[in-house]
């Protein structure tokens, strides 16, 4: 993927929200994986939290964190599967200002290359909520690695060409 090395890297402020009824700080390997990659890329880790698989709690947390001025991007892990408790996509759809449909499509393509037709079970989504990016990844560590390594590390790097999410951040509130 083309990175224009003549440009200076611009770090953004990122928060991680783990959505799970069973994960704790001690066993949140997906959150750990994302945090390491975010920091290694040069971005700022602003906040990290774990919340239950509850659509109201997910909506409340995403709404609140998307209004925090020091957070540019929320990355969630968990709750994107097909079980009854997997409600992250539903919560995001209810409160999103704009949907970033291509993220889920590209994530499933990347997943297909790694896990074949099992990729169809992923409901990874992305959106803008209050002009803050929200990327919702599955709860597996492998899926978080793939989502970051194959998509987000590039789209959250202003040097990535021909376009990226960072360069349009100043224009997200345009009317």
Regions found by a protein language model. Give the residues of each.
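Non-catalytic beta/alpha edge segments that cap or flank active sites
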Residues: 1-175
């Amino acid at each position: 993927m083309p990175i224009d090395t003549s440009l200076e890297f611009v770090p953004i402020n990122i928060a991680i929200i783990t959505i799970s009824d069973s994960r704790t700080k001690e066993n949140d390997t997906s959150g750990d994986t994302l945090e390491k990659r975010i920091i290694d890329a040069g971005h700022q880790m602003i906040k990290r939290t774990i919340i239950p698989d509850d659509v109201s709690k997910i909506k409340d947390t995403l709404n609140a964190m998307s209004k925090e001025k020091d957070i540019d991007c929320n990355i969630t892990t968990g709750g994107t599967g097909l079980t009854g408790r997997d409600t992250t996509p539903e919560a995001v759809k209810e409160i999103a200002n704009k949907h970033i449909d291509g993220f889920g499509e590209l994530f499933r393509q990347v997943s297909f290359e790694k896990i074949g037709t099992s990729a169809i079970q992923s409901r990874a989504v992305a959106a803008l909520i209050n002009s803050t990016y929200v990327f919702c990844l599955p709860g597996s560590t492998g899926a978080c690695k793939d989502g970051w390594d194959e998509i987000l590390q590039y789209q959250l790097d202003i040097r990535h060409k021909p376009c990226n999410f960072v360069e349009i951040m100043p224009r997200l509130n345009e009317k």
